[in-house]
Amino acid sequence: MAHIIDGKKIAELTRADIAARVAAFHKDNGILPGLAVVIVGENPASKVYVRNKKKASEDVGMYSLVCEMPESTTQEELMAKLAELKSDEKIHGILVQLPLPKHLDEEEVLKFIPPEKDVDAFHAENTGHIMIGDYQFLPCTPAGVMTMLEHENIEIAGKNCVVIGRSNIVGKPMAMLLLHANGTVTICHSRTKNLAEVTKSADILVVAIGKARFVTGDMIKPGAVVIDVGMNRDENGKLCGDVDFESAEKIAGAITPVPGGVGPMTITTLLENTLRAAQMAVSKK
């Protein structure tokens, strides 16, 4: 049976360290790192995520602001709110909760957030820095995965690393971070042929496709490390990942559960990025 990688426990340890550094930053500078989260509409899942982000930031001693805007918000109104946050010196990190309602231009919104306040690391400038390995912020989920691997003393250098999923938010940056850690990286997607053959070559398998229990135990190399980024509801409404945990657990050497795996680490990286943004802002004064 696989070793269970407890993301919740790792997140608690990491957040305790962040809280200590936030306190030291406040003592030295007389200000708190500030995070603003903008949410448009009434998406229930988004509301839960925003509530969790607010609580987590306040728990480590940060200043937290949630800007709730109605579903009918226009592009101009949203951009005006972002402009206000952009010039607010109390706010060091700005996050727009995705997805946005369909009538809003997500790309324009993400481009408008200044790179130095882009704590989700979605701005093209920040993604470019990730490509060359010279970054100020890391995308929250991939960086959270890297922290987990480091905490578990899982060697990446020289290992076959397979990432299923090529999104800009998880798949692509995840592959780049594994590459920077000297892994031999393969990215798989919907057009990949003989997927199971590729996944069975992986020493480290990261799955981020948004399909409930898509990867089964017979697709996994015995002893592999399996990181499940997925967050889905099955036909019974139960929370589950992209990996069929029951069959995978019997084959893998280590595996992240859903819930309690990658999710807590994503928010932890957001806190880390917000503190870094505040430190950068102070150093520029």
Give the ranges of each region predicted by the language model.
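Short, well-structured alpha-helical segments in soluble
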Residues: E77-E89
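Positively charged, low-complexity intrinsically disordered leader regions
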Residues: M1-N29
